Amino acid sequence: MSGHNKWANIKHRKAAQDAKRSKIFTKLIREIIVAAREGGGNPDTNPRLRAVLEKAREANMPKDTVERSIKKGTGELEGEKYEEIIYEAYAPGGVALYILALTDNKNRTAQELRHILSKNGGSLAESGSVAWIFERKGAIEISASKISDMDEFTLLAIDAGAEDIEEGDPVIVYVAPESLTAVKEALAKNGFEGESKITYKPKNTVKVTGSDAEKVLKLIDALEDNDDVQEVFGNFDIDDAELEAIMAKLEG
């Protein structure tokens, strides 16, 4: 899975850059509204809301914006009705994409995504043709600097309920989605605090290099720039050095 861990690190850096714009707030507000609508406004009993509130804190979202978003989700305030939609797509090089969107107009979103895909060498896929490649998992990202003994950490994580551990920086601990909070808390008690989220992990990957690799990353960047798109997952495998070089070029 070379490239995927580096990708997690780059996406974290991208999120920090996005935070300088208002775009990340737009996405977080939608996520808070939907999480509160589905599981209630109390983060203690709503793991999904708890996870997105953590992201909101990291992005320095104003407290009143967070509270208004929760109230819109619970119905205490009138708000937009967002629908969760998953789009499946193909990128250059045979890479599969799993696109998570929150939209108040699915026809508009489908049209916009179709345009972005076709402009960047991709295409929408039939429902079900890509979904089987990805597994829904909980993921905890921990800075490698916090881990002095990887073997010891691995044993601790497995005892806590980890299913898989991906080395790199950050170290990524994969767990069953329903175990995410418990495993995160167990690791934190032992000094390994990290960021948690729900992710979609590919069962297999496709090696891409050169122009195909650049096209894949450019396409994902364009998709995630769309306000309706929350996150894009791909089963690409790009060497770390090449991935870093391409992202530096795209960011420049």
UniProtKB/Swiss-Prot annotation:
GO BP field = regulation of DNA-templated transcription
Give the species.
Answer: Fervidobacterium nodosum (strain ATCC 35602 / DSM 5306 / Rt17-B1)
Cross-referenced PANTHER family: TRANSCRIPTIONAL REGULATORY PROTEIN YEBC-RELATED, TRANSLATIONAL ACTIVATOR OF CYTOCHROME C OXIDASE 1
Q: What GO terms are given for molecular function?
A: DNA binding
SUPFAM superfamilies attached to this UniProt entry? YebC-like (SSF75625)
Query: Could you tell me which InterPro entries the record lists for this protein?
Result: Integrase-like_N (IPR017856), TACO1_YebC-like_2nd/3rd_dom (IPR048300), TACO1_YebC_N (IPR049083), Transcrip_reg_TACO1-like (IPR002876), Transcrip_reg_TACO1-like_dom3 (IPR026564), YebC-like (IPR029072)
What's any one GO cellular component for it?
Answer: cytosol
Q: Has UniProt tagged this entry with the keyword DNA-binding?
A: yes
- Annotated keywords: Cytoplasm, DNA-binding, Transcription, Transcription regulation
Which top-rank group of organisms is this from?
Bacteria
Q: Which HAMAP family match?
A: Transcrip_reg_TACO1 (MF_00693)
Q: Which coarse location class applies to the principal site listed for this UniProt protein? A: cytoplasm
Q: Does the keyword Iron-sulfur apply?
A: no
Q: Which family does it belong to?
A: Belongs to the TACO1 family.
Location(s) in or outside the cell: Cytoplasm
Q: What name does this protein carry?
A: Probable transcriptional regulatory protein Fnod_1106
